[in-house]
Amino acid sequence: TMIQPLNNVHFLFSGSNRHMMTEIFNSSKRPFFASTRIISLPPISAESYSRFIAEKFLENKRKISPEAIGFILEWTRRHTYYTQSVCNTLFSSGGKEIDIHSVKETCGEILDEQEKTFLQYRNLLTGNQWQLLMAVAKEGKVYKPHSGEFLSKHSLGTPASITRALDALLTKEMIYEEIDSSGKYYSVYDLFLSRWLERQ
């Protein structure tokens, strides 16, 4: 390839679609197979993020309470895009003193603004897919989507129908698959959609 003969040049390939990135670099059928070192970036630590947010608000003569920051980081799961979106919305509101109540209100407004888009998703999914999507959102992380406990708790169908719904949601990138120390789990891809579904 053109990359191999280049000296003193480093390439960084990044993307949020883990399945696609894994396929590009770990599949022997792909031209980039085994050509890179894979690095997974964990979320920014809550301590570092809290300090950063507080400093940015203070630089602009605004004060945000530690409780408000804590709620933002928990609600956005420290995902950079969603954290920035909430903070930018709060900042644009012009308030000089931001507490947890104003943060909760702002989060609700963000979800309300996107409700029409979220409702459109329902038309793109079958009943089983929508019910499974809601169940995954309400759980946050689902390690055993075929377990009797999960199916019963959310009044879902048979394990076979859940397998089909799960595959469809993964293909449509409505949910994603991830691995942590507890094993493989599924979560809703769009965090704002996930939080909106929790309210339903």
Residue spans of the language-model regions?
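Conserved Walker B catalytic segment
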Residues: 1-17, 26-28
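Conserved nucleotide-binding/hydrolysis micro-motifs of P-loop NTPases
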Residues: 16-20, 44-46, 90, 193
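Amphipathic alpha-helical "lid/sensor" segments that cap RecA-like P-loop NTPase cores
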Residues: 54-117, 127
